[in-house]
């Protein structure tokens, strides 16, 4: 059987494999196992059954999502920049990109830099690399074990500049290699799963929390929270974006207050009310 791409029907994680025996994301403590056993979807089945949409969030920012829901259902963010600046930056990826979504990406100028925070945000990175062949696909080195579906061209240690004012920062904690992308120009922090944002039906953020494992309510240790704080304290931002939410209500000062509140208590998962 030749190598091909398969998506886990439970979490959406993609593998380049013969016939996957299991899913490394689901077998990890941070995610739930499928109740009815393993089921892996070949790319052709996913392509036939799924569509998606591209939504402009700001002048220079687009959000790509997949419908119907696939796996964890994350968002692929696209920061639009000129070719002179190094081209567009794609951070995280939607679970799958339809032909129409890929056409929209082409119309917006393609992808010059590609990166993601951690495995829950990888989505269909392999598709974006295959379609646009950006010179940089950056993943922090401690998460390389999860990257067999695509080829990492720019592993890094603590920080990596994707362009002037666009810097990846290693945060760890939730995953050993978790990283955040700071957009200094627009004052945004693409924070991965550093923060979980609860939102109401209107999309307003209501609570914020930090977890080692969201599904299992496993808290972070104080040392892990301090890792987050050390990164956040040095950055200027007015909004955070996770693989799942856009939270313009959460800026640097509030993020620090949330972390300081967590550090003032024994390790626990506490949803900080906004």
Question: What are these regions, as identified by a protein language model?
Answer:
Residues 73, 101-102, 125-126, 200-201, ...:
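Short glycine-/acidic-enriched loop or helix-start segments at secondary-structure transitions
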Residues 2-66:
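N-terminal juxtadomain amphipathic helix
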Residues 2-22, 28-32, 45-59, 88-97, 126-273:
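Metallo-beta-lactamase
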Residues 63, 116, 138-139, 154-155, ...:
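Structural signal for conserved beta-strand scaffold positions within catalytic alpha/beta enzyme cores
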Residues 86, 110-111, 134, 236-238:
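A general structural motif
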Residues 98-142:
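Active-site metal-binding motif and surrounding structural segment of the metallo-beta-lactamase
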Residues 50-101, 179-193:
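Conserved beta-strand hairpin/beta-sheet module of binuclear metal-dependent hydrolase folds
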